[in-house]
């Protein structure tokens, strides 16, 4: 009886492995993730208690346009249609090129939902109009 159990276990393992290989063969990179957040600048105008920046703020930095273009191109190559958040632990309106970034991702990933999250301190009606014209979702 023990040898039958071992054989049954081996058959089950083989079926499991075959199914896993079939899933891997049908793998679509665009299904790997459905949301990405990109921090284009590392600065924020606040120091919220719940944010890691309140304890250890990163040095002020800006993502290079070359890297941003590379990310947009790679997402386009995947036919990415998920969410793109142009913020992480920063205030997106502190990025003077924010509207350009929105246009870039709208061009390369037209099916994506492009969004930001802001504390609102720097928002004006004019800035809102411009970011919507740029293509923010």
PLM features: what roles do these ranges have?
Residues 2-137:
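Conserved alpha-helical substructure of the radical SAM core
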